[in-house]
Curated annotation (Swiss-Prot):
Organism expressing this protein natively: Rice gall dwarf virus
Function: Minor capsid protein present in the outer capsid, which is required for adsorption of the virus onto host insect cells.
Taxonomic lineage: Viruses, Riboviria, Orthornavirae, Duplornaviricota, Resentoviricetes
Active site, UniProt feature: 954, 1111
Protein name per the record: Minor outer capsid protein P2
KW Transcription regulation (keyword) present: no
């Protein structure tokens, strides 16, 4: 349908809203006109002469933009005005359109809320098609060019129509039997017969009666029943397959059916349909032979993908989905019926010209833009302010994780002690020894679990700032030892384990009689301490003591992120010492407990960057009775519980020991011991650990509700009116915005907010086309191209700057595509990628085609580069490749994470250093760089070598694309590199013996390619090689790739297949190779084929040199061509590169 010469009714124009990705030119043309008309109502009321002057200006503006609008200009010049109140008529219609837009948001939000609770995953996209109020009839709007409409969820089929069958289809005011039919190419697909006398509605699909409604209008309600019981609604899909045959499906809350020929086949789910096709052939391009009347609700196109889980039966899923659609349709009908009827009657009472139709479309889009503005994120400056002075003991914010196992009885430490034996004759024997300690039941210990809330205020958020202190690994058996902290005779606090032997105040007796429990034979120490002490865990040389702060930004649009302009400071006060830290805030995304995506302001500061700590002492008990003895604990017996390892002490009379009186050695009696559990550390009194510590070591002591640094309490402090300045996008309406994939927000946001410091909202540039073009050109500068590549779903970014109307459509479909975390719900990610591409490709092509880029800039818009979060690994990826022709198989190597999609630059050893240690070191270093385990020196070395393109290895590029075709995954890998595969020939000839065949061979280094294509089998992870003809390679190229001379006699098909599979095997064996660069770039349709052609016509211009033009330079050029549309000028001609771009455009 050309525009606007063949526009015969509003119906033709408003079809544009049905499927935006397939109406690129028409939408952009209309959009561009909209940007040039500021006051449409005022124009409509002008005199004929004034209107002609305005129309002439509009035509000149369109011509200046260079848009392909010749037909529109001619129609505008011939525009005739009629004296009628068109403004009021079109205003009514505009209101109806705005209701449609708002209620589409309602549907999106309603769908989103219901999907959160599903165990399976249902992905539904809704496109509203606006019914015309100014047509001769009110028939269903099935498009003329349906064959060109892509079904974005199933590339084997194209949806012809999808409609809801229910009581809303019936005119209850009639007294005659009514037949309503959907007819395609003279075939009756659906027929509804309504019998007013009995209030029965029968529905038949391809001649078979499907169900019968018994309708009741009592109390203005409709009771719906079919033969199987309660029924909500019926959804019918008609799709045309690639072979031109029509398949028909029906979905109800009870079952899913597929109709084959003249009978139906029941299925329990949407998975595993019969592969048969019906007999309905489509022989005509015009399928608008429709005889039914649809009143009230607008036509809805619904696409559904559905992944079932065992925990959630399909009938419940479908019932929930269909009930929700039915409810949404009812809402639409109630809201819009009267508005449509009013507009319809007003339009039919007056005469409209084609120019009126054009004007009406402009008003329609203005209302859509108003809706976009109301729900589009606005770039906003905000300042978070600390309301009051905040000072608190640092321990109040401490949160720890107890990592001791419940059965822990590990040896925690040993102390140096001296053992004293005294007999009745005052003979004293002193010997050196060790006391060993078994861990108490630390798994049951209550550890710190605190946080502090700091009051803040801001323009858009009034949430509090949450402060938490983390000490990773502090309560972990692998990291800590057990020790005693006590005051020595000189009032210096130190660890008992560090006492000199002469200063030890722990004494052994002869072995006590513990014959009743041999399991604690090692725990037999006697302790006598004259001073207060503390028992705890010691963590030596800690690396981290993290202070985290977070504040949730409720008003922020989560898909766009933000950037922090300046941070504030906080301080630690330790007595008279003050240590200042920068908060280092950033904006990150997260998902709350309800499943809603949000943004929050976060800061993570390691306090040990300025606070020197040699050891952290975490008190687990203080002055527990009998554990540490003081003067008041004489003659106290404390023992052991044989069922739980713990430690205990036995007390002796201090005077007797000190005076060496003649006495009998005290032998502990047998008794029933009680378990000595560590006390709750949060309730301990820290007074006993404050004081003077032994010099030479910095100890941080955590005791109860206080933290001490070398005996002095540590406090956190943040001053009143401290400011944190930031920018982020807010969502005024609270409706869903574009959120199609999980993006790296922190990378995107800084660039988005720096596009234009004066850009405060999308609205500020909607009506200024030139400003939008200038900003886009600025964004496309080479220095910024890499950053722009990640900004693909920014409503306030390039998409809306270039095409505001597209942004409005994306608002509708984007919120549904990102219903929930796809990984969590097991969705097939390829379906989401296909849907996402449909509008990305539109943005790419439309902007290039209509000259919104500079004329001398050959790059396509790199919106097509999907960010890291959107390219997920496929559920079925090639881990094993079966080669049936040569009866072999290949198990993929260690780099399987990179074989689903994207571009790899793979390196392998060239043996330049022989087989010595240097060659081995290079291989090991490459492996570490690939795995992310390399140290700084190794990373820097490889980074330098890669930057200069002199890594002592061979590099080749793997362009990888995985498509899902029905239930089959097709994996295509195009290998490109110097002397790779079938490389380009030049003027060097080789003569075979007998001079029977002369073959050109490449005897110099040059670019080459090989395309390996495999498809999934019924075994997950197993792929097999396809027929070699599907690769697009010739027989000669396959033989060249294998290093074989092409035979004198043309080889058989099977022989070529064997050679093809042997090359796949060689290429697929990736052990001892390393992917040092990976680009998550998804190829546009036709891009790989266009790239192949570009290499073929350009490779002979590539002049190989060991330095400066080697395999690594070529790999870098290939990545630039594919991911950035960057032309390597030294070996690719400009005309060839333009043809590469044009080929992709034509394919799109």
């Amino acid at each position: 349908m050309s525009y606007p010469g063949n526009v015969h009714s509003l119906r033709d124009l408003y079809n544009v809203f049905k499927d935006a990705p397939n109406r690129e030119r028409l939408i952009l043309d209309m959009n561009s006109q909209l940007a040039r008309i500021d006051n449409i109502a005022q124009i409509l009321t002008m005199t004929e002469e004034q209107e002609k002057e305005v129309i002439a200006k509009m035509s000149a503006s369109l011509a200046n933009l260079g848009l392909n609008m010749d037909n529109a200009i001619r129609e505008l010049k011939n525009m005739e005005t009629v004296h009628m109140d068109r403004v009021s008529v079109l205003t009514v219609y505009q209101s109806a359109v705005l209701n449609i837009t708002n209620n589409t948001h309602t549907i999106s939000d309603s769908m989103k809320s219901i999907m959160y609770d599903l165990s399976g995953y249902v992905n539904t996209t809704i496109y509203p098609t606006i019914q015309s109020p100014a047509t001769e009839d009110r028939s269903s709007l099935i498009p003329l060019n349906y064959k060109n409409m892509k079904n974005i969820f199933d590339d084997k089929h194209t949806i012809v129509f999808a409609t809801v069958i229910g009581p809303q289809c019936v005119d209850f005011t009639t007294e005659d039997v009514t037949n309503i039919s959907w007819i395609v190419d003279s075939h009756e697909i659906i027929k509804i017969t309504y019998y007013p006398s009995s209030l029965i509605m029968e529905t038949s699909i391809v001649g078979n009666r499907y169900l019968q409604y018994q309708l009741s209008l009592s109390n203005q309600t409709i009771d719906e029943y079919d033969n199987n019981g309660p029924y909500s609604c019926l959804l019918v899909f008609c799709v045309v397959g690639a072979n031109g045959l029509l398949d028909i499906y029906s979905m109800s809350s009870q079952q899913v059916r597929k109709y084959v020929n003249d009978y139906e086949v029941g299925e329990s789910s949407l998975i595993g349909y019969s592969t048969k096709h019906g007999s309905l052939h489509l022989s005509s391009n015009d399928i608008r032979n429709i005889s039914h009347e649809l009143s009230g609700s607008p036509y809805i196109d619904v696409r559904v993908t559905y992944s079932i889980t065992a925990a959630f039966p399909d009938s419940q899923l479908l019932s929930m989905l269909l009930d929700n659609i039915q409810q949404s349709l009812g809402t639409l009908t109630a809201c819009e019926s009267k508005s449509f009827d009013d507009a319809y009657r007003a339009a039919m009472d007056n005469q409209f010209t084609k120019a009126d139709v054009l004007t009406s479309s402009i008003i329609t889009m203005r209302s859509s833009l108003n809706s976009l503005i109301s729900s589009s994120p606005l770039l906003s400056d905000d300042t978070i302010r600390i309301v009051d002075d905040c000072t608190f003991q640092l321990a109040s914010a401490l949160t720890l994780t107890n990592e001791f196992a419940s059965d822990s009885a590990n040896l925690l430490g040993t102390f140096k002690v001296k053992q004293t034996t005294i007999d009745r004759y005052s003979n004293t024997k002193i010997s050196e020894g060790k006391a060993v300690y078994l861990s108490p039941t630390l798994a049951t210990m209550n550890v710190h679990s605190g946080s502090v809330v700091v009051s803040t205020d801001s323009f858009h958020n009034n949430n509090a700032l949450k402060v938490m202190l983390l000490a990773p690994g502090l309560v972990k058996p692998d990291n800590v030892n057990f020790d005693l902290l006590s005051v020595k005779s000189n009032n210096v606090i130190d660890l008992v384990s560090d006492y000199k032997l002469d200063d030890a105040i722990i004494q052994f007796t002869d072995q006590p009689d513990y014959s009743s429990t041999t399991s604690i034979a090692n725990a037999k120490s006697v302790v006598y301490m004259k001073t207060t002490g503390c028992i705890g865990l010691t963590y030596s040389n800690p690396n981290e003591l993290i202070l985290n702060m977070s504040l949730q930004l409720n008003s922020a649009a989560p898909s766009l992120g933000g950037v922090v302009n300046n941070n504030t400071t906080f301080s630690l006060t330790i007595g008279s010492t003050i240590i200042n830290y920068v908060t280092d805030f950033e904006i990150t995304d997260f998902t709350d407990s309800s499943g809603k995506q949000s943004l929050k302001l976060t800061s993570s500061v390691n306090l040990l960057t300025k606070l020197s700590v040699d050891m952290i002492f975490y008190a687990v008990s203080i002055n527990a009775g009998g554990v540490i003895a003081t003067d008041t604990h004489k003659y106290t017996d404390t023992g052991f519980d044989s069922s739980n390892y713990t430690y205990g002490w036995e007390m002796y009379d201090s005077a007797a020991l000190n005076d060496y009186q003649d006495m009998t050695v005290v032998t502990p009696p047998k008794f029933t011991a009680k378990m000595l559990r560590p006390q709750d550390a949060s309730k301990l009194n820290g007074d006993c650990v404050g004081g003077t510590y032994k010099k030479g070591r910095n100890i941080l002591v955590i005791a109860g509700n206080r933290i001490f640094y070398n005996g002095v309490s540590v406090y956190f402090k943040m001053q009143k009116n401290s400011m944190i300045s930031l920018k982020y996008f807010i969502n005024p309406s609270g409706l869903s915005t574009v959120d199609t994939c999980d993006v790296r927000i922190t990378r995107n946001a800084a660039f988005l907010t720096q596009i234009d410091t004066k850009l405060m909202s999308v609205q500020s540039v909607l009506n200024d086309v030139q400003r939008r073009i200038d900003i886009i050109n600025q964004l496309m500068q080479p220095s910024r191209i890499q950053t722009l590549a990640t900004i693909i779903q920014g409503i306030g970014g390039v998409v809306s700057l270039a095409m505001p109307l597209l942004g409005a459509i994306v608002v509708t479909i984007g919120a549904i595509v990102s219903i929930a975390d796809p990984n969590h719900h097991g969705v097939d990610y390829q379906a989401v990628l296909n849907a996402f591409h449909s509008w990305c490709q539109y943005a790419v092509v439309a902007r290039m085609n209509y000259g919104l880029l500079k004329a001398d800039d050959p790059k396509l818009d790199i919106l097509k580069r999907i960010s890291d979060g959107s390219v997920n690994t496929f559920r079925n990826k090639p881990k094993k490749i079966t080669l049936p022709g040569i009866d072999d198989e290949v198990i993929r190597g260690t780099s399987t994470d990179y074989i689903d999609t994207g571009i790899n630059v793979r390196y392998n050893s060239m043996g330049l250093f022989g087989e010595g240690k240097l060659e081995e070191w290079m291989a090991n270093t490459a492996l570490k760089v690939q795995d992310g385990t390399a140290n700084i020196f190794q990373k820097n070395l490889f980074s330098l070598l890669q930057k200069r393109k002199i890594v002592p290895m061979h590099a080749r590029v793997e362009i990888i694309q995985t498509e899902k075709i029905g239930d089959v995954y097709r994996n295509t890998i195009l290998y490109a590199g110097i002397n790779e595969g079938s490389y380009i020939e030049n003027s060097v000839y080789l003569t075979r013996s007998g001079n029977t065949r002369i073959k050109r061979l490449n005897m110099t280094s040059g670019p080459g390619m090989f395309k390996a294509v495999t498809e999934s089998t019924t075994e997950v992870g197993n792929f097999k090689a396809v027929d070699w003809t599907l690769s697009g390679m010739t027989k000669e190229e396959i033989y060249n790739a294998a290093g074989l001379m092409y035979p004198n006699k043309n080889p058989a098909h099977s022989e070529v297949q064997d050679v093809y599979e042997s090359v796949i095997r060689d290429m697929a064996e990736i052990d001892d190779t390393w992917v040092l660069q990976h680009h998550k770039t998804v190829m546009l349709p036709g891009q790989i084929e266009a790239f192949e052609h570009l290499i073929r016509v350009s490779a002979n211009k590539f002049q190989y040199a060991f330095i400066g033009s080697n395999c690594q330079n070529f790999a870098d050029d290939v990545v630039g061509i594919l991911s950035q549309f960057k032309r390597p000028k030294r070996w690719v001609d400009e005309n060839d590169f333009k043809q590469y771009i044009q080929s992709i455009y034509d394919e799109l």
